Structure formats: C-alpha cells, structure tokens
Amino acid sequence: MARVTVEDCVDKVPNRFELVMLAAHRAREISAGAELTVDRDNDKNPVVSLREIAEETQSADALRERLIESNQSQIEVDEPEEDSMALLMGGEADKPQEDDMSEEKLLRALMEAQGQG
C-alpha cells in the first residue's frame, strides 16, 4: 500500500494546520485504546489516523468536536454560604439577635438566679 500523505487528506480537511491537529488527536485516542476503523497494516498511530481521515471512517466534524471537548476544562464555582446568600437576596442573615445586656445586668441576673435556686 502506498504511504498516506497529507495530500490524501487535504480534500477532507482543507486547512493543513487543522488536519495535523485532528490527526494528532486521533493518534492520541488510538494510543489510549480507541478502536481502529481501518486495518493497521503495520503502520504507526499517526499514519493510521491520517488513513482514517483520508478514507472518511473518522469524520472531520466528529474529530473536531472531540478535540474541542478534550481541551475544555470545568471550573468549579464556590456557592456562597447561606448567610451570604440571604444578604445577597435582600433578606436578613440567620443569626441570633444580639442582647444589649451590660455586665452589670448580667451579674444582677446571675445573683437573682442563685438566690432563687
């Protein structure tokens, strides 16, 4: 069989840079254990990936989507805590009301509690 060149694939993917990116991505998929859609014929993964593109057993659109998905990353957004969420929504924070008890009032209340107990 004749060697596969980029020329065999240019009619499927006109941009040579994109073709190389897609073929490299497919070669990495094959290295990771993806099923081949053409016979290996003792070729290395990059050549097999170019043959798959040339024979259209792997569509350029599907490869492009998989390449994009593999390069995307998920960013986890921290959710605000309940108190912060209530304030953001215009409500009041869920916290105990502050007592305006002075030290003198506290001591008096303790003395009364001990005297009654």
Curated annotation (Swiss-Prot):
It holds the Pfam family RNA_pol_Rpb6. HAMAP family: RNApol_bact_RpoZ. The keyword Transcription applies. GO terms for molecular function: DNA binding; DNA-directed RNA polymerase activity. The lineage of its organism: Bacteria, Pseudomonadati, Pseudomonadota, Alphaproteobacteria, Rhodobacterales. The gene is rpoZ. Keywords: DNA-directed RNA polymerase, Nucleotidyltransferase, Transcription, Transferase. The keyword Nucleotidyltransferase applies. This is DNA-directed RNA polymerase subunit omega. GO terms for biological process: DNA-templated transcription. Belongs to the RNA polymerase subunit omega family. It is an enzyme of class 2 (transferase). SMART domains: RNA_pol_Rpb6. It catalyses: RNA(n) + a ribonucleoside 5'-triphosphate = RNA(n+1) + diphosphate.
